[in-house]
Amino acid sequence: MKFFEFSQNNSGGHFDVDDKVTHRVLIEAENAGEAIEIAESLGMYWNGCDEGMDCPCCGDRWYTPWSNDGKVFPFAYGRFGEKEANSICENYGAELKKRDKESIGGLEWDVLFKTPEEYMQYLADAYGWTKPDGYIYYKDGRKVSIYSKKVK
């Protein structure tokens, strides 16, 4: 089972937030097609500019993931310097992992998030704009709301 991430573009200068969608949504599904079907049932759409719902200058609010975009946890995220990677690991219970590939500019560390909640909490705190900032939809029907510690 994989998790597919849908990150909302603030088309028109605002995010749509309700009890189904928010800034970032993570959906557990067998494949991208199933995740897209679930996303559409939550109110996401893919043609907002063409349909006149989204700002043509800002772009579409939502984009579909690629078929190979699914995340499996534990999930290695990053390309950080060692100090920043260590700080993230300490704050979110993640693990430090040296990159297997060549580093770029000394950014040779990944952060290994063990759970979707750890990953989404990090993203909410690092890039959060909304309350809540993330929803996680599990295949078993559970929904978890993620709140940024920085958004009041």
Question: What are the residue ranges of the model-derived segments?
Answer:
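A generic structural signal for ordered secondary structure
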Residues: 3, 26-28, 143
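Short, mixed-charge low-complexity intrinsically disordered segments
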Residues: 41-152
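Short aromatic-glycine-(Arg/Gly/Cys) micro-motifs in beta-strand/loop hairpins
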Residues: 1-22
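Short, flexible N-terminal segments of the mature chain
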Residues: 16-43
